[in-house]
Amino acid sequence: LVTSGFFPGSLWFLYELTGDPQWKTRASEQTERLERIKNLTSDHDIGFRMGCSYGNGYRITGDPAYRDVLIQSARSLATRFQPEAGVIMSWNPNKRWKCPVIIDNMMNLELLFNAAIYSGDSSFYKIAVSHADRTMEEHFRPDGSCYHVIDYSIKDGKVRHRQTAQGYADESIWSRGQAWAIYGYAVCYRETKDRKYLDQALKTFNMMKNLENMPEDLIPYWDMSAPNIPNEPRDVSTASCIASALYEISTMDVPDAAGYKMYADSIMVSLSSPAYRAALGTNGNFLLMHSVGSIPHNSEIDVPLNYADYY
């Protein structure tokens, strides 16, 4: 599954925060079940799967076997790089798309940045930067909002289409896509110190923050352009990812770092309230309620999602 790395990652967080060895044991067991994925080249989500599981495991334990899995995972991800377009292909070609790249793919670049450090192979870093740069050029509208899917030509690298798959419409503001962009470019700034990446993260965040229909509790609707607001489902996974990105940004040397932390704190107050945080033993034992996977696909509507809990 695309999302198989988030639960092991959450277990690593529990071990990190409590020091209780039972969580280390459980995290290791769940992480090591994913080892075979290190050779998977059929989609881009290996970054999600392995960065959240093995990435946290290596960060916390320093186990060299975990480092080796991460390097091999990065090699697998790098096979999807398309030089003419300068991007990592997200999904495989079909009748509709030739080289589709989704904004979610920004979340996979951290695996490449880390692998460059672990291995000394600068090609991982160069691929990550190339992907971030081309995505910045092609995915974003003048107001800072982003498309979900950009389809490129493999032959000459030109853009064929700008679309959405999981949002309300091609020109709508699909909320979780904006969260992926904010988080992904915050990581790019942290790893490269190139200010343009931070500027992009903040431009997209400020666009979301300043939307007139942003709810008072700061938990976005699944798509901020959906037609039936305020009677549209919220997406808690968007809120948790934005908060996580803002906490990251607040640790950086940026103007008004305290303001970004304050906004993240406000999101966390909402997420911790009974409106969104499930009572113990309910909600399938997930922490958070009211996330949305994909309304256009009639999939995971108003349900708990493991990546909402993770972020």
Describe the residue ranges of each PLM region.
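Glycan-recognition and catalytic cores of secretory/periplasmic carbohydrate-active enzymes
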Residues: 1-311
